[in-house]
Amino acid sequence: MVITIKDIINIPYDKAEKTIIEFIKNKIEEANLKGAVIGLSGGVDSSVTLLLTMKAIGIERVTALIMPDTRVTPKRDIEDALWLVKKYGIKYYVIRIDDIVDSYSAMPFFNINYNIPTGNLRARIRMNILYYYANLHNYIVVGTGDRSEILIGYFTKYGDGGVDILPIGSLFKTQVRKMGDYLGLPEKITSKPSSPALWLGHKAEEELGIKYETIDLVLYALFDKHIEPEKVPEHTGVDPSIVAKILEMHRKTRHKRLSPPIPSLPWVKEPIREI
């Protein structure tokens, strides 16, 4: 069996759309919330999520927050985010986080030039803003992570990973792009290179060192076709070293996908459970 990218992207997008819309609607109703707030970056994941949420509960119940740090956020991303909310008439706010980031200079160990801790700080600041707005209006925080990013742990813990629901969490990145086409998003958004923009010039595939098409091939083989890791190269044509790297990403980031661990005491069978 040879697996190609066509096997991954050839899914019934109409059924996926319907299922996700019902999921969003049900989760908001179950929580007895009034609406939804989404962090909109101008990329394909957040744009697709915004449109699906809008379809689920109506434009009037959705707010988009555009939160650039103008020193590192590409101007094009801001423009694309603004284009989208204006096209559909979605309520939005542009909140520059430059000064909020700078306020952390009160910490004696703060250094804005450290890309990873400062980049993650930007993601966590955005999470705080989203939850402040959600608490203020009794809204749900809708996450925009896709399945590829979740499985390899390519998100900030308690940053963009800090959300209430992940509507596109069952779609690989390549599928999200096709979903964007299906929903009528322009090519300038659906084909835009993935860019968290947590620091200047930050591009996902450059940081990962692997294209998403390759990542998705390997993840699809492992998780959907249940192929043993050592046999993935012969089924996908992906180099064994790349397969090993993707698998390592998944395993090393397991903690991001789980609740914080709790020690088991001899007299406590289940420290935390639902009743």
UniProtKB/Swiss-Prot annotation:
GO molecular function: ATP binding; glutaminase activity; metal ion binding; NAD+ synthase (glutamine-hydrolyzing) activity; NAD+ synthase activity
CDD domains: NAD_synthase
Annotated keywords: ATP-binding, Ligase, Magnesium, Metal-binding, NAD, Nucleotide-binding
Cellular compartments per GO CC: cytoplasm
Cited SUPFAM superfamilies: Adenine nucleotide alpha hydrolases-like (SSF52402)
This enzyme's EC code(s): 6.3.1.5
Protein name listed in UniProt: NH(3)-dependent NAD(+) synthetase
Origin species: Staphylothermus marinus (strain ATCC 43588 / DSM 3639 / JCM 9404 / F1)
Gene of this entry: nadE
